[in-house]
């Protein structure tokens, strides 16, 4: 504390012993020790206070550094905010200018022109609506199968066979020598062959 060595302490003790004597030396030693102890305590307290003050100063310095960095960051944020606001204002001005230019370039239709356009467009709308309705009706109408009428068969003209002449018996030899008459009957394509009577059969039936 006081930078006193061992030799110096020995010298002080010898001087005190000579000056004070052996009777007063113990009291003087206790008194000196008490004052030395108080001086150390006082020095320790001062030292602690100095250390506390130094720590406080360091804390203050660190706090000031932090505050300075925060201020710098705040200034940077403000600058960026101002730049963003300026860019937004410039963009808004450009957009509003373009809108004004387009609005001035686009002709404004008068009410008479609008009415004329609506009147000219109404027949087209009606025609389109009629075509749409017709197409819908064609799609929804049911398909009805109609039977075709059957044409009647052509009437067949029946020609009666000629009356066979009844010849008496005495003239049988003359009939035998004479050629037999052949009855010509018109034959229709649709008449079956079984329905046509033959002339010889009728002659034989009518002979007695």
Curated annotation (Swiss-Prot):
The Tat system comprises two distinct complexes: a TatABC complex, containing multiple copies of TatA, TatB and TatC subunits, and a separate TatA complex, containing only TatA subunits. Substrates initially bind to the TatABC complex, which probably triggers association of the separate TatA complex to form the active translocon. Belongs to the TatB family. It is found in: Cell inner membrane. The chain crosses the membrane at residues 1-21. This is Sec-independent protein translocase protein TatB. GO terms for biological process: protein transport by the Tat complex. The lineage of its organism: Bacteria, Pseudomonadati, Pseudomonadota, Gammaproteobacteria, Lysobacterales. Keywords: Cell inner membrane, Cell membrane, Membrane, Protein transport, Translocation, Transmembrane, Transmembrane helix, Transport. Part of the twin-arginine translocation (Tat) system that transports large folded proteins containing a characteristic twin-arginine motif in their signal peptide across membranes. Together with TatC, TatB is part of a receptor directly interacting with Tat signal peptides. TatB may form an oligomeric binding site that transiently accommodates folded Tat precursor proteins before their translocation. It is a single-pass membrane protein. One of its GO terms (molecular function) is protein transmembrane transporter activity. GO terms for cellular component: TAT protein transport complex. Residues 188-208 are annotated as: Disordered. It comes from Xanthomonas axonopodis pv. citri (strain 306). InterPro entries: TatA/B/E, TatB.
């Amino acid at each position: 504390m006081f930078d006193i060595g061992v030799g110096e302490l020995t010298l002080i003790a010898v001087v005190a012993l000579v000056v004070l004597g052996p009777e007063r030396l113990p009291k003087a030693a206790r008194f000196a020790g008490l004052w030395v102890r108080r001086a150390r305590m006082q020095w320790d307290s001062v030292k602690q206070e100095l250390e506390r003050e130094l720590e406080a100063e360091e804390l203050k310095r660190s706090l000031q550094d932090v505050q300075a960095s925060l201020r710098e960051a705040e200034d940077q944020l403000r600058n960026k905010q101002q730049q963003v606001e300026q860019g937004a204002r410039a963009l808004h001005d450009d957009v509003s200018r373009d809108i004004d230019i387009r609005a001035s370039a686009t002709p404004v239709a008068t009410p008479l022109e609008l009415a004329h356009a609506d009147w000219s467009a109404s027949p087209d709308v009606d025609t389109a609506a009629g075509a749409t309705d017709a197409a819908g009706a064609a799609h929804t109408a049911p398909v009805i199968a109609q039977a075709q009428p059957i044409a009647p068969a052509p009437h067949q003209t029946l020609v009666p066979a000629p009356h066979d002449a009844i010849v008496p018996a005495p003239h049988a030899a003359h009939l035998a020598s004479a050629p037999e008459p052949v009855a010509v009957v018109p034959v229709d394509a649709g008449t079956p062959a079984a329905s046509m009577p033959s002339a010889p059969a009728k002659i034989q039936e009518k002979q007695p």
